[in-house]
Every structure is written in C-alpha cells, then in structure tokens.
Amino acid sequence: MKKMFILVTVLLLVLSLNGCSLMLMQMAAMPAEPTEPTVVTEPTQPEKEWPGFNGTDYKYVYLYEEGRERAWEEDLVYMAANYIDDYGRLSRFPFPVKAPDDSYLSDEFYEPELQQYWIEETNAMIRDIPNMTDTEILYRIQKLVATLEDGHASIYLPRSPLFPIGFVPFFREDGMDVRAVMLPKAQEDALFTKLVAINGVPVEEVVTRLEPYMSYENEAWLMTSIFHCYCYSYATQEDILVITGIQEKAGQSVTYTLESDDGKMFDLELRAESSLDSSKLTGMLPMDSYSQMYKDMDHYYWYEAFPQEDMIYLRINEFTQDNSYTFLNLGNDMLKDVRANGGKVGKMIVDLRDNPGGLTFAGYHEFVNVLKRIDIGQVYVLVDSNTFSNGIIMAATIKREIPESLWVGTPAGQPPNFYGGMSDGDFVMPNCDVIIRMPTSFNKTLPDYEGDTLMPDLLVYPTIEDYKNGVDTVLEAVRALP
C-alpha cells in the first residue's frame, strides 16, 4: 500500500468552510423555544373571509396575536407571499431575474398545483407552530423550498451537532457504495467499510427519509448532499436524523452499521458533538496521486506544468476572485509558459472535482478566452458529483468555446443550464433573521443540452481500492490517454 496521510483537519475545514456548507450556518437570531405547547383556538370567521397578505388574493390564516407564535406566523406568511406568490418580489434586486424567453417571475413559471401546495402547506405550518420547536419549523420550511427542485433554493439551517464519522459516496455504473473515510481513532479498523444502516435503518431507507428535505436537481447531487463529507453530509447531522425519525431524541447515541468487503460487520455507537475534536479522529486520503488534487488548498486556483508528459494540470478549488492574482493573470502566465516551452502542449487538464462554485463574476470567461489562444492538443475537464454551480458553468463554457474538449469523471451535481446567481442578503425572514437562498438569474451555457446532469464524455468511476492505495483513478485515466 502506498503512503497515506491523515486529513482529518482538512475534512473538518471543508465541512465548515466549503461553499456548500453555508447550509450549516448558525442563525443570527431566533425566537425563544417554547416551554409548553400553546392551546390554539381556531378563528371564528370562515377562513375564506380572512384578508390576503399584503393585498394579494392568496389566503393565509392568522391565528396568533403576540409572542413567539405571532413572530413565526409573520415570518411564514412573509416567506410564502414573497418567495413564490408575489411575482414582483425581486424588482428591488440589482440583477433582475430573467429566463431566456420568459420572465422567471411570470404567472406561467410555477405550476398552479405547486402554488396551491405552498398555500396549503404554509397554512398547515401556521396551525402547527405551537407544537413545533424552532428547528422543526425551519426544517419544514426547507422541505417546502425543496419542492422547487432547484439546487440553489434552500434555507440556511442552524448548525447541527455532528456525529464523528465521515463518508464519501463511490458511484458505479450500476449503483453506489457509501464508504467511511473518517472515524474515531478507536474504530480505525473500520475505515473504508461500506455504510449499511443508521440506527437499524437501511441506507436506501435513509435516502428515502432525507430526500424530501434536499434541494437537488439530479441523483448525483442528492447522494452527495446526504453522504459526502466534503458537502453537507446530512447523514452525520443529528437534527435531521431526529426530524426524520432515524434518531429518537437529540443527545442519544446512534449506531452506524458498517460492513467490510470480506463481510465483517461493525456497529459504531456514536454521539453527536457540537464541534468535532480532530485529535480524536482519523481520516485517510491517499498521498501519491491524490496529492496533486489537494496539493494546494490555500489558493483558489493554480496550475503545474509536466514537461515530461507534455501536460499542464490546472486545479480550481472554488470560484472566489483573488484580486492579487486573477483568473486572467493565471491564463496569461500559462500562455507565457507554453510559448516559452515550444509554443504548444499536448494535454490540458482542468480539474473541477469537489468544486462547489462561488462568485458568478470570477473572471472565468476571460480565462477561457486566453485558453483558446494556447495551442493545445486536447483539453480534458474533470468533474464529479460535487462539481456544482460555477464549477458547472466553467465546464460548460469550456465545452462551448472549445467543442473538442472532453468532460471526464462521474456525473456532475447539476446540468449545464440552471438557476443561480444567488442574492443571499435580499431574502431574510423579518423576525428570526434566517436567510432563504434565492436564485436571481438563469444560466443557459449550453442551450441545446438536455438532461438533468452534466454527463461526462468519458465515464471514469473511482474505486475504493484505488482510493485506499493512493491512486487517483480519473487523473490516471487521462494521463494514460495518447
């Protein structure tokens, strides 16, 4: 076995800082939790006679006059009326929402059945306020937002206690295995085993229970959101395990059942922690080939030339503009290097794996224009299920501008055409100060592309054996190409 190194700190850092981990932010302020359920008296008037919110035709019940219940009632009606009902709600935004041939906010954009469901579910939530904790209300809002089937539409949930275990989903042509890649040191012998069940609930049922709360557009992003330790990793969050009945009560231990490839079973009884102590955990990633992908986590983007292989490897960790060294600077430096070493390069590898996106205007269009000026034999763009948002836009832009380029890896987390351009600060529920993420623009990078995922031209599935032995399956497959 090749040399291994412990990457617990990186795993935890990614969990807390990754662009996808915004969903784990602590709420700025929340109403106090109830001590005892409040007895609710239904309004004496028929519901149809109650006025609509802000003069709209939609009817939301008004049951509470003061206190926590009134605050949540106002937030729920504000959320429903402004997030889906009031089609003029984004007129104050600096970047109006527009789809290619129609307004994102037109009456035809949402299906009438979906609008009606929002109205009914909002009224149901208002009635249930006294019987729900604040966390339960927020997860119910997230469940409602998830009905939009938009990977960018979601709520900033409160930070949940985490179980000291981390997973990576390994996709195959005929399915998927979820492998444990981070564990307490005392259970190190169970590293790389398959997840079988959580508290006796089989993996398939875990997915079924968590799926209604997930904002996703394809199966790759769904599985990544639930299991991947570089993303949300909901399967290790106590709050949602309690919400979905996988865990009976907060604070109780949960049993993660794992199975080795030779059939040995492991039952790990774990308790969630408000913050994980990396000194008590072990997590291994291969050091040899994988060191290329994770070689420099301190910079947003960087490249390395391999003259002996006639190859340039470009790694983009995330799309955050570094004003001291822009994408344009990066492209120009590569152009100079190529011209100084014969004027052409056989392979250009652009690695967008584990890239959750970032700033919409990070300058990647300028970079691609420079890329087109380099004499390249073949451009390969590496993607996986955690390639999302602007990572998708970059991959699609390269394909559009350099049609002979090839996508390599596993199905990506989004299709090339999707709603994005987040405006996080513009939709805040007034009393609890919780942000709901709202897309503000439609990205149609490849207008003729059909399908719910960016599908690689060359499908290459990483294997657990390669992972354990330090082999980057996808990168090595590209290196082996003529």
Name each model-derived stretch.
Residues M4-M23:
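Sec-dependent N-terminal signal peptides of Gram-positive bacterial secreted proteins and lipoproteins
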Residues M1-M4, D351:
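Positively charged n-region of N-terminal signal peptides that target proteins for export
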Residues L11, R172, Q308, P430-C432:
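A short, polar/charged loop/turn motif at coil->beta-strand junctions and beta-hairpin connectors
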Residues S21-K347, Q378:
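Flexible, low-complexity junctional segments that flank or bridge functional domains
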Residues K336-I349, R353-L481:
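Conserved acidic, small-residue-rich alpha-beta core segments centered on
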